[in-house]
Amino acid sequence: MLTATSETSPLAKSDDYLAAFFMDDFIGGRYSSVSSVGGVILSLAFGPDVFARILDGMAEEDKLATNKDIKANPDLLDALIGVYERNVQGYPSTAVLPYSQALSRQAIHLQQCDMESNGKTVNRFGEPVNYVTGPVIFGEPGTNGQHSFY
């Protein structure tokens, strides 16, 4: 059995594991798929070559996200649209309704990623902010939620 944990965790010193893969304490859950946590699981499930390709794709996305041209940076464009919808239009929520059962967990995943980061009511210094922050994210596959949400 293997463990993926921080070096300060009791699991790191346990003799119950064949190997321990370490990750820094500051790495949040949204990054765990490309940390040792996800790396071990994805490599065992799909092979190390697939995991290497995932890391390459993540590196390409990082490069894309640094482009200052809004037309060539979909991440920046999406973020600015979100700020506009929330702060100018006043939309309090965002529905995610994928029309594929294969994406049935997408709304929950996006909810965790977005709301964990953007739903704060204080700034990085712990001071209250004087503007609205991220919207409430909710949803279901469109085939289930279409009559409930719209």
Which positions does each model-derived feature cover?
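Active-site phosphate/pyrophosphate-binding segments
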Residues: 1-150
